[in-house]
UniProtKB/Swiss-Prot annotation:
CDD domains: M3A_MIP. This is Mitochondrial intermediate peptidase. The keyword Secreted does not apply. The active site is at E594. It catalyses: Release of an N-terminal octapeptide as second stage of processing of some proteins imported into the mitochondrion. It comes from the Eukaryota. One of its GO terms (biological process) is protein processing involved in protein targeting to mitochondrion. The gene is OCT1. It comes from Lodderomyces elongisporus (strain ATCC 11503 / CBS 2605 / JCM 1781 / NBRC 1676 / NRRL YB-4239). Belongs to the peptidase M3 family. One of its GO terms (cellular component) is mitochondrial matrix. InterPro entries: M3A_MIP, MetalloPept_cat_dom_sf, Neurolysin/TOP_dom2, Pept_M3A_M3B, Pept_M3A_M3B_dom. SUPFAM superfamilies: Metalloproteases ('zincins'), catalytic domain. Pfam families: Peptidase_M3 (PF01432). Binds 1 zinc ion.
Length: 811
């Protein structure tokens, strides 16, 4: 998840439930044709993209995988990544960055010269927005390539590009002349009366950005500020890159610990893996690779708490270097905030967010934690421990202290086994499923693999449901849903040689406005990337070209519709490839979530780049994605979308009921744990960190702070590992990680108000589209919510508004 970046604000980067007895209510709207539906499914699921197995006619040729997605091999047509003619090679990317920098410098000279004229003043903010777009388009595509591309040469070129452009952006952010001209224009009432609301909004945004970048500092201090900002960016990039790395690749266990493993299959797995250990072996010691499935199986099935603890800590340990990088960028952020005159980095970050100040965030989180703990969390923990001898006699506080984080999956297995025995009535024995210790689930078709880690806590229902949700089925189903809600659909779009980073994996979709047949933007989908966690990348933002810009020259770098550059969004996931790839319900949630961001980018149509799509407040941007998870959890949606990958039969509603019930077993606990992460984020960017700077940068100890937060908040408390060094959002969402929870609360209220009655309602979809999605960043988020929910008291966006959201949501 990530939103686009303003000129000076570049960031590297559950919902309401319905009764299962409610029947699916499909509003009477025109849905996509069967031909387009089948074409979408085939594009992701079939070897040859044909309809009904026909491949001997023109229609069949149209669906050829080679013709559609692997480009023309005869050299008749080729381009660069995302149809940017420069991006044909790593060297081309560096050339593109240099061209972009030159374009930006030329534009700055032009603006500085023309601002002396009346027309130059009127065009100034639009050209500032154009300047921002030039740089952000370059740095955003570089960031995408750095994170996603398989070729290290491309990755190295992307890093070089990022450094070139980011350094220049920081120079612009402290350009006194650019700032002074902007201030004069914004303070000229006659000029303001001739500007559009969007121009005024962007002008105010950029003025804030200049001022938050130390524009009032003396030259020496500004230089220090730029250096500090760039150093934070480099450290953050390193932190994110290494966040999935383990402190050690192997963990050793003694022969006594080995004997504590009751499952003979797991023992044999340990012995086989131990034989492959590359280091010096000690007698009576076994070695387990932490990157394998063995540690997870031990935590789920082994009765020895000490052994589970060892596995859990090993999996959650970050390297010492990683923790040190975290300490340093937290300290540098505190120093940056101090230089700008803020009480803390959190105060700096929240000044123009929905929450406005850290005190409001802490109040929101504290109230949420108290409500969760006193209502659902303790109930879930009691249910989880019901089968454990003596646990029923413990007080609430004793129970909370007794259940450790490494007990969670072990207890959950016992809990769900008991639950299944009373609900499935022997269904397990009659269903062909994998054994409890396999890491992937295979159906009777040996070429079909589910893209999920499966363990013994998976129910028969959850395993069987995978067969009804192939990637193609989900994408075609989303097109059907968006057609119903917004009159927008997906159409398979052929790619040209060089347009995508992997011709075998990547698919391109045209996002089509059904009402006028116009293209709204493009999606590039890579669901089986070997190196990327599920992510949303805005590669190009929507923007109307200025009159002086050359359409033909611009068309070499972006995809156009008349005088608009169209939004380009990439969705990347790390699912296991199959033929077809079948998805767990959690992975269906993931696609829906990321598609929420994508549709925000498509529907949020503005003239100016800085306001389009997801370029809104960070604590507002997650609402569309989180709301989509309400759709993915609603049986009225899943039953309409799901169909068996071989037979085409609709998904049985009883399977959805069983699986949904089991998925929510620890819903409140998981929300509470997420609130702990948000609280840690606040603590690491608080006033106390600024005060610690008096003792020197080395006084910042993030591990001590992490363990103290865990001790204070207790539920599944971790006082042993350095997991915080593996939490990338501490950089990419520094001081605003709470936004996930705030937006979940807001999305829940929106769901209850608009969609709970009928998730396919065109009326509800249009209201949501018109009041929330279409504005991008042009309208105050609290005003959007007040209008969408018809709750006028939200419009002020103060602490009371956050309290109202909390009271009306059902987290």
């Amino acid at each position: 998840m990530r939103s686009g970046s303003r000129l000076s604000n570049y960031l590297v980067r559950l919902s309401g439930r319905v009764s299962f007895t409610q029947k699916r209510s499909l509003t009477n709207v025109k849905l996509p044709s069967n031909v387009n539906y089948e074409r979408l499914k085939a594009a992701f699921d079939s070897d040859e993209h044909t309809l009904n197995g026909k491949n001997n006619n023109n229609e069949g040729k149209l669906f050829s995988k080679t013709a559609l997605f692997q480009g023309q091999k005869d050299g008749s047509a080729s381009t660069g990544l995302f149809k940017n003619s420069y991006l044909t090679s790593p060297q081309g990317l560096v050339q593109f960055s240099k061209k972009s920098k030159l374009q930006a410098q030329t534009l700055v000279d032009e603006m500085t010269r023309d601002v002396l004229t009346h027309q130059g003043k009127l065009d100034y903010i639009k050209k500032l927005d154009q300047l921002s777009d030039i740089l952000c388009r370059t740095i955003d595509v570089a960031e995408f390539i750095r994170v996603v591309h398989d070729d290290q040469k491309w990755v190295d070129a992307a890093q070089q590009t990022h450094e070139i452009i980011f350094e220049y952006m920081n120079q612009l952010n402290t350009n006194v002349e650019l700032y002074a001209n902007l201030v004069k224009i914004l303070e000229d009432k006659d000029l303001i009366s001739q500007l559009s609301d969007e121009e005024i909004k962007v002008g105010e945004y950029l003025r804030q950005d200049f001022e938050r970048s130390g524009i009032h500092m003396d030259p020496q201090s500004r230089d220090q500020f730029v250096s500090l900002t760039q150093e934070i960016s480099i450290m953050g990039s390193h932190f994110n890159n290494e966040s999935s790395s383990l402190k050690s690749d192997w963990i050793s266990i003694t022969s006594n610990e080995f004997s504590a493993i009751e499952d003979r299959f797991i023992q044999s797995e340990v012995m086989r893996a131990s034989a492959l250990y590359p280091g010096k072996k000690e007698s009576g010691t076994y070695y387990i690779p932490l990157a394998s499935a063995i540690p997870y199986r031990i935590m789920i099935q082994c009765g020895s708490g000490n052994l589970r603890k060892k596995m859990w800590i090993g999996l959650h340990e970050a390297s010492d270097e990683q923790v040190q990088v975290l300490n340093h960028f937290v300290a540098y952020r505190a120093l940056l905030a101090k230089m700008l005159g803020y009480d803390s980095y959190a105060h700096y970050q929240l000044e123009h967010k929905m929450a406005k100040k850290p005190e409001n965030v802490l109040s929101f989180l504290t109230n949420l934690q108290e409500n969760l703990k006193n209502s659902q969390v303790l109930k879930e923990l009691r249910a989880l421990s019901a089968l454990q001898q003596g646990y029923s006699l413990l007080s609430d506080e004793e129970l909370i202290r007794q259940i450790k984080p490494w007990d969670r999956d072990f207890l959950l297995k016992s809990f769900e086994a008991k639950k299944l025995s009373s609900t499935e009535n022997g269904e397990k024995a009659s269903t062909d499923t994998s054994t409890s210790t396999t890491t992937s689930t295979t159906t009777t078709d040996s070429t079909t693999t589910t893209a999920t880690f499966s363990n013994s806590t998976d129910s028969v229902a959850i395993k069987r449901l995978c067969e009804y949700f192939s990637i193609g089925t989900v994408i075609a189903g989303l097109s059907k849903l968006f057609s119903a809600l917004y009159n927008i659909s997906f159409v398979v779009e052929p790619t040209v040689k060089g347009e995508v980073w992997n011709e075998k994996r990547v698919r391109k979709l045209n996002v089509l406005n059904n009402s006028n047949g116009e293209t709204m933007g493009y999606l590039y989908l890579d669901f089986c990337s070997p190196k990327v966690f599920p992510s949303h990348f805005t590669v190009v933002c929507l923007r109307q070209l200025n009159k002086a810009e050359s359409v033909s020259e611009h068309g070499d770098m972006v995809q156009l519709s008349k005088d608009y550059q169209l939004p380009v969004v990439a969705l990347v996931c790390n699912f296991t490839s199959g033929n077809p790839t079948l998805l767990s319900l959690d992975q269906v949630d993931t696609i829906f979530h990321e598609m929420g961001h994508a549709m925000h980018s498509m529907i949020g149509r503005t003239q100016l780049h800085n306001l389009s799509g997801t370029r809104c407040a960070t604590d507002f941007v997650e609402i569309p994605s989180v709301l989509m998870e309400s759709f993915s959890k609603d049986p009225r949606v899943l039953s309409e979308i799901g169909c068996h990958y071989r037979t085409g039969e609709p998904v049985p509603i009883n399977l959805l009921e069983q699986a949904q019930s089991q998925r929510s077993a620890l819903e409140a606990c998981e929300t509470f744990v997420q609130s702990k992460m948000a609280m840690l984020d606040q603590e690491l960017h608080s006033k106390e960190i600024v005060e610690l700077l008096r003792q020197g940068l080395e006084a910042i100890n993030s591990t001590e702070i992490y363990h103290q937060v865990e001790r204070d908040l207790e539920i599944f408390a971790d006082e042993w590992s350095t997991w915080h060094g593996k939490f990338p959002h501490l950089f990419s969402y520094g001081a605003v990680y709470y936004s996930y929870l705030l937006d979940r609360a807001i999305a829940n209220v929106l769901w209850q108000k608009l969609f709970a009655k009928d998730p396919w309602s065109r009326d509800a979809g249009i209201k949501y589209k018109e009041e929330i999605l279409k504005w991008g960043g042009t309208k105050d988020p609290w005003a959007c919510l007040a209008d969408a929910l018809q709750m006028e008291e939200l419009r002020k966006g103060d602490a009371h508004a956050m309290q109202i959201i909390g009271e009306n949501s059902k987290l």
